[in-house]
Amino acid sequence: MAMLRSGYRRFGCLRAALKSLAQTHHRSITFCIDPSLGLNEEQKGFQKVAFDFAAREMAPNMAEWDQKELFPVDVMRKAAQLGFGGVYVRTDVGGSGLSRLDTSVIFEALATGCTSTTAYISIHNMCAWMIDSFGNEEQRHKFCPPLCTMEKFASYCLTEPGSGSDAASLLTSAKQQGDHYILNGSKAFISGGGESDIYVVMCRTGGSGAKGISCIVVEKGTPGLSFGKKEKKVGWNSQPTRAVIFEDCAVPVANRIGTEGQGFLIAMKGLNGGRINVASCSLGAAHASVILTQEHLKVRKQFGAPLARSQYLQFQLADMATKLVASRLMIRTAAVALQEEREDAVALCSMAKLFATEECFAICNQALQMHGGYGYLKDYAVQQYMRDSRVHQILEGSNEVMRMLISRNLLQD
């Protein structure tokens, strides 16, 4: 037992497993869960870069970031040097200009090293994409370059204390006075709140409903912008979560992204990609959990034999692997549909987010169970993957909302 504990303590087994995973496509043995299956050579190349970065820079630190609630700014900026700060932002403003499928491949790989940190990076990317896609040339060249290098960090501000799933009922107001908007209201559960430099804010410039919402960029340090206390969370502890508060906060009209009344459309377009991104983060957590369980079953002995000889546990592992691969296929199908702007892309993104976040959490939870008492210790990575992936069923549109969007597509006339 002492040897087993020392082998796993402080996530040492995780680092070794991820290093091995990063080298998988160079090996003669191909496992059925190989994440490079179906990818072209270029995609395999940047996937390996992401896996290597996850194993080298993230996995050795994920436990400390979680337990000390550290926001790993320096490591994220290293990720940005590899092009991960603006993965699907256009190249003329510093982005990598990659596809939605490419982005999913990268976020899955990074999430094996730290799911929480990768999830923040994915939100940051979504904000940069919104500005790149809907901003004018001046806005694109002002905001996107420092976001792509992660010199500056971004937060997405949609949810409010009184409007979660019913986002179109948001109350934060922006009243124009001359060449400024005066913002009043608050946003809740904002990832990066208080630490980010740029806040992409959905606020009400017109009447009630979705058509009265606009998108405005608020920069940190603007008078009237403040933040609530840092929330204590079950997971996602490597990224701070705070309320974002606006009290007579004057923001230049020039910071409005798109036209007045276009904000809800921008928000929903961003979330379609955000759902692929967060599902990919769940996929990375589940993939790492399967790898760790695979190793644990070979090493841990009970009743005089390795756990890997138990047919029941073999079947459990097989189910986990099957759910993992099915999730990956759904995510990648939806990513391609979104890239091609297919009419069913919203439903497919919703399906992928719904299925992958639920099944991948189930994989992480089962991995903890199969580690026995060790899985419940914070010295072992499986518990962190389970905690960090749980919230994915709630954010970027709850899975109940995903079911609404899917059924709406099916029942349309």
Curated annotation (Swiss-Prot):
<feature type="binding site">
    <location>
        <begin position="369"/>
        <end position="373"/>
    </location>
    <ligand>
        <name>FAD</name>
    </ligand>
</feature>
<comment type="pathway">
    <text>Amino-acid degradation; L-valine degradation.</text>
</comment>
<keyword id="KW-0101">Branched-chain amino acid catabolism</keyword>
<dbReference type="InterPro" id="IPR034178">
    <property type="entry name" value="IBD"/>
</dbReference>
<dbReference type="GO" id="GO:0006574">
    <property type="term" value="P:valine catabolic process"/>
</dbReference>
<dbReference type="InterPro" id="IPR046373">
    <property type="entry name" value="Acyl-CoA_Oxase/DH_mid-dom_sf"/>
</dbReference>
<feature type="binding site">
    <location>
        <position position="300"/>
    </location>
    <ligand>
        <name>FAD</name>
    </ligand>
</feature>
<dbReference type="InterPro" id="IPR006089">
    <property type="entry name" value="Acyl-CoA_DH_CS"/>
</dbReference>
<keyword id="KW-0560">Oxidoreductase</keyword>
<feature type="modified residue" description="N6-acetyllysine">
    <location>
        <position position="229"/>
    </location>
</feature>
<feature type="modified residue" description="N6-acetyllysine; alternate">
    <location>
        <position position="48"/>
    </location>
</feature>
<feature type="binding site">
    <location>
        <begin position="310"/>
        <end position="311"/>
    </location>
    <ligand>
        <name>FAD</name>
    </ligand>
</feature>
<keyword id="KW-0285">Flavoprotein</keyword>
<comment type="subunit">
    <text>Homotetramer, formed by a dimer of dimers.</text>
</comment>
<keyword id="KW-0274">FAD</keyword>
<dbReference type="GO" id="GO:0003853">
    <property type="term" value="F:short-chain 2-methyl fatty acyl-CoA dehydrogenase activity"/>
</dbReference>
<feature type="transit peptide" description="Mitochondrion">
    <location>
        <begin position="1"/>
        <end position="20"/>
    </location>
</feature>
<dbReference type="InterPro" id="IPR013786">
    <property type="entry name" value="AcylCoA_DH/ox_N"/>
</dbReference>
<feature type="active site" description="Proton acceptor">
    <location>
        <position position="396"/>
    </location>
</feature>
<feature type="modified residue" description="N6-succinyllysine; alternate">
    <location>
        <position position="48"/>
    </location>
</feature>
<feature type="modified residue" description="N6-succinyllysine">
    <location>
        <position position="211"/>
    </location>
</feature>
<feature type="binding site">
    <location>
        <position position="408"/>
    </location>
    <ligand>
        <name>substrate</name>
    </ligand>
</feature>
<dbReference type="InterPro" id="IPR036250">
    <property type="entry name" value="AcylCo_DH-like_C"/>
</dbReference>
<feature type="binding site">
    <location>
        <position position="165"/>
    </location>
    <ligand>
        <name>substrate</name>
    </ligand>
</feature>
<dbReference type="InterPro" id="IPR009075">
    <property type="entry name" value="AcylCo_DH/oxidase_C"/>
</dbReference>
<dbReference type="GO" id="GO:0050660">
    <property type="term" value="F:flavin adenine dinucleotide binding"/>
</dbReference>
<dbReference type="Pfam" id="PF00441">
    <property type="entry name" value="Acyl-CoA_dh_1"/>
</dbReference>
<feature type="binding site" description="in other chain">
    <location>
        <begin position="398"/>
        <end position="400"/>
    </location>
    <ligand>
        <name>FAD</name>
    </ligand>
</feature>
<feature type="binding site">
    <location>
        <begin position="272"/>
        <end position="275"/>
    </location>
    <ligand>
        <name>substrate</name>
    </ligand>
</feature>
<feature type="binding site" description="in other chain">
    <location>
        <begin position="189"/>
        <end position="191"/>
    </location>
    <ligand>
        <name>FAD</name>
    </ligand>
</feature>
<keyword id="KW-0007">Acetylation</keyword>
<dbReference type="InterPro" id="IPR006091">
    <property type="entry name" value="Acyl-CoA_Oxase/DH_mid-dom"/>
</dbReference>
<dbReference type="InterPro" id="IPR052547">
    <property type="entry name" value="Mito_Isobutyryl-CoADH"/>
</dbReference>
<comment type="function">
    <text>Isobutyryl-CoA dehydrogenase which catalyzes the conversion of 2-methylpropanoyl-CoA to (2E)-2-methylpropenoyl-CoA in the valine catabolic pathway. To a lesser extent, also able to catalyze the oxidation of (2S)-2-methylbutanoyl-CoA.</text>
</comment>
<dbReference type="GO" id="GO:0005739">
    <property type="term" value="C:mitochondrion"/>
</dbReference>
<comment type="similarity">
    <text>Belongs to the acyl-CoA dehydrogenase family.</text>
</comment>
<feature type="binding site" description="in other chain">
    <location>
        <begin position="156"/>
        <end position="165"/>
    </location>
    <ligand>
        <name>FAD</name>
    </ligand>
</feature>
<dbReference type="GO" id="GO:0006629">
    <property type="term" value="P:lipid metabolic process"/>
</dbReference>
<dbReference type="InterPro" id="IPR037069">
    <property type="entry name" value="AcylCoA_DH/ox_N_sf"/>
</dbReference>
<feature type="modified residue" description="N6-succinyllysine">
    <location>
        <position position="269"/>
    </location>
</feature>
<keyword id="KW-0809">Transit peptide</keyword>
<dbReference type="InterPro" id="IPR009100">
    <property type="entry name" value="AcylCoA_DH/oxidase_NM_dom_sf"/>
</dbReference>
